[in-house]
From Swiss-Prot:
Protein name: Oxygen-dependent coproporphyrinogen-III oxidase, mitochondrial
Stored SUPFAM superfamilies: Coproporphyrinogen III oxidase
Site feature location: Important for dimerization: 316
Modified residues (Phosphoserine): 101
Coarse class of the protein's main subcellular location: mitochondrion
Gene Ontology biological-process annotations: heme A biosynthetic process; heme B biosynthetic process; heme biosynthetic process; heme O biosynthetic process; potassium ion transport; protoporphyrinogen IX biosynthetic process; response to arsenic-containing substance; response to insecticide
NCBIfam families cross-referenced by the UniProt entry: PRK05330.1
Swiss-Prot/TrEMBL keywords: Acetylation, Heme biosynthesis, Mitochondrion, Oxidoreductase, Phosphoprotein, Porphyrin biosynthesis, Transit peptide
A Pfam match: Coprogen_oxidas
Active-site residues, record numbering mapped to chain: 247
Location of region: Disordered: 89-112
Naturally occurring in which organism (per UniProt): Mus musculus (Mouse)
Length: 443
């Protein structure tokens, strides 16, 4: 399957809603429901310790601010969702999703309940509604992101062996909600967050105008445009300098016009940020993503790999945030079903692309010098997120935004030193060379 790139571009809208990399804990008085999660499929006492503290575990005060953050998140979606500069498209484009066979249901009631029992929490959408529309893309995507969250959390908790995920389920007054899972200060992971969000409502007139400016003709009814946005996102910061940071995000968005016509698209990506370069790890990560992409077309991986290298560029440093991966947005072809299958395949590649690398290095010995370099590289991670990530910038400059949610993608610790430069031909200099000149890792 061929793939074509056109004009349009990045994904600030989703991070504006989710607080960058889906870390939003939007709030209403009903959303302070944090708990320590026992992973699905486990029973009895666990050797890990629960983390029932920190901003994710507190309710009570500040609910007015949290409600404002929810509204700011919607404003973020409206203002940023449609400011793209690039677009992904798999061609040829068909007229839409395949029609389901008469009487066919993706899940019967018992099977749906079984699937949901493996999630970190019950779905945002009520089960009766999911059963009512089994072939609707909103149902398929919500179940997929819930499964992805559970799979990633289960894998990370197993690797850590000490800390549990705190599960924070929140509801959005205007419609929808989400589940934020956080593991912090564990044995292996300094900070790991895996979050899903399913929100819906009406786009503002400002958002509609920005979307029209992008070339989409939208017909409003009573000045309203119903929308649905959902996705899963994660950022993972291990403690060991030889275990890399990883981020992924997969999302779906649709807007319904007055005449019933729906505009829809998918976006997402997965990227790796090592402190020290390990050629074998880089090849494994990129090869796993390439194998996922190749199931849907031989031209997809190289285009999305380049898009990732270009997006995660720290201009003032002249280097990338990491060694890349894949990145795409506004994917609306060749059909809704095929685009969904592609996104699902990519999401399924998250655990096999990353967890073996963490297992390999989580117990590596390291020196104070290694840890210092990790902290300096974490500083670069912070610089990109605060200075260049559109969703983060929008949230920080939006009155009433929930800062804890916006900054949750940042590591617990980072460092800056004046005029720091690693010795020539050192292992620190080796990673800088790759960050300044991206490599082809799979050929």
């Amino acid at each position: 399957m061929a793939l074509r790139l056109g004009r349009l571009g990045s994904d600030p809208w989703w991070r504006a809603v989710l607080g960058d990399y889906a870390q939003l804990r939007a709030a209403s008085p009903r959303c302070a429901s944090a708990r320590v999660c026992q992973l699905p499929g486990t029973a009895g006492p666990q050797p890990r310790r629960g983390l029932g503290y920190g901003p994710w575990a507190r309710g009570g005060s500040g609910l007015g601010t949290r409600l404002a953050a929810t509204l700011a998140g919607l404003a973020g979606l409206a203002a940023a969702a449609f400011g793209h500069v690039q677009r992904a498209e798999m061609v040829p484009k068909s007229s839409g999703a395949r029609s389901p066979s008469p009487g066919r249901r993706e899940e019967d009631g018992d099977e749906l309940a079984r699937r949901c029992s493996t999630f970190m929490s019950s779905p945002v959408t009520e089960l009766r509604e999911l059963r009512r529309r089994p072939e609707d893309m909103k149902t398929k995507m919500e179940l997929m992101i819930m499964e992805t969250q559970a799979q990633v959390c289960r894998a990370l908790a197993q690797v850590d062996g000490v800390a549990d995920f705190t599960v924070d389920r929140w509801e959005r007054k205007e419609g929808g909600g989400g589940i934020t899972c956080v593991l912090q200060d564990g044995r292996v992971f300094e900070k790991a967050g895996v979050s899903i969000s399913v929100v819906h409502g009406n786009l503002s007139e400002e958002a509609a105008n920005q979307m029209r400016g992008r070339g989409k003709t939208l017909k409003t009814k009573d000045s309203k445009l119903p929308f649905t946005a959902m996705g899963v996102s994660s950022v993972i910061h291990p403690k060991n300098p030889y275990a890399p940071t990883m981020h992924f995000n997969y999302r779906y968005f649709e807007v319904e016009e007055a005449d019933g016509n729906t505009h829809w698209w998918f976006g997402g990506g997965c990227d790796l940020t090592p402190t020290y370069l390990n050629q074998e790890d880089a090849v494994h990560f990129h090869r796993t993503l390439k194998e996922a992409c190749d199931q849907h077309g031989p031209d997809i991986y190289p285009k999305f790999k380049k898009w990732c290298d270009d997006y995660f560029f720290i201009v003032h440093r002249g280097e990338r945030r990491g060694i890349g991966g894949i990145f795409f947005d506004d994917l609306d072809s060749p059909s809704k079903e095929e685009a969904f299958r592609f996104v699902k395949t990519c999401a399924e590649a998250v655990v096999p692309s990353y967890v073996p690398i963490v297992k390999k290095h989580c117990d590596d010995s390291y020196t104070p010098r290694d840890k210092l370099w990790q902290q300096l590289r974490r500083g670069r991670y912070v610089e990109f997120n605060l200075l260049y990530d559109r969703g983060t910038k929008f949230g920080l400059f939006t009155p009433g935004s929930r800062i804890e949610s916006i900054l949750m993608s940042l590591p617990l610790t980072a460092r800056w030193e004046y005029m720091h430069s690693p010795p020539e031909n050192s292992k620190e200099a080796e990673i800088l060379e790759v960050l300044r000149h991206p490599k082809d890792w799979v050929h």
